[in-house]
Amino acid sequence: MIDKARRILLVAAATLPLMASHAWAAGLISIIVTDPANPYWLTEGQVAKATAESLGYTANVSAHKGDTNTESTMIDTAITNKSVAIILDPANADGSIGAVKKAIAANIPVFLVNAEINQDGLAKAQLVSNNAQGAAIGAQQWVEAIGDKGNYVELFGNPADNNAATRSNGYETVLTQYSDLKKVGKEVANWDRTQGYQKMQSLLQAHPDIVGVISGNDEMALGAIAALKEAGKLSQVKVGGFDGSPDAVAAVKAGEMQYTVLQPVAVFSAEAVKQADKFIKTGSTGAASEKQLFDCALITKDNVDKYTGPFTLSQ
């Protein structure tokens, strides 16, 4: 009996290195986001990492903060660390192409999330929100809030990010249908709350009679709300956002923001990792196309209670 027990223990001990080797064999997935100080990008990284780990990979998250040189260095690190895949939120539609090419030259597949690059056929997949659709539903909701006449201003995101122009153009397509709505100012605030606050202060000084602010993302919108509060104007000016961040949802619930457009970042961040896993194992992502659009949803005071977690809206 003792000999039998010893043999079982020896067999079990012998299999441990094999089990450890098998677990390690899945490899490292490197995740590169823009800036986790923004809850949107924080969620992007957290969801991608958790999904990778649930599939048996190790994963790390780093941030380039919109700087292509930093991004390039992080790609170098991913190559040095022998990553089996890279999940990248690109810093620049044109400027990130070289970094993606560098990873591909090292035989590491790249999966882009949230933003596109201006070259097809490099990344294995580009998974992004349907920004045009999101902008359209947001702009229509904004018109319902402010009415069909009056002066308004726009806060624009990072010009190096195609999403900024796509959303702005989507707003324009809807709002130009209302001839008595006049855009009297537009400022670049680079997706940033502090810049949104500062630009809103300047816009208010130049255009004190505005009735609305339409923003390319929630952080800029929240900055605008802070400036409007400070000026005692929030009750007169309606603000709309885009992202579906927890702070924006709280502002909608408080009646300070009219709506936010929810980007399904939690969905496509997880999906990018799943497609990376499938590609690693089969040589195919399983998707019908490289560029994949994920529809956005509107969050208003009528459905805000269905917000069940960061960037998650129950049906």
Where are these regions (language model features)?
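A residue-level marker of the well-folded mature domains of exported/periplasmic proteins
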Residues: 4, 23-315
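Bacterial N-terminal signal peptides that target proteins for export
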Residues: 1-10
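Bacterial N-terminal signal peptides
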Residues: 10-21
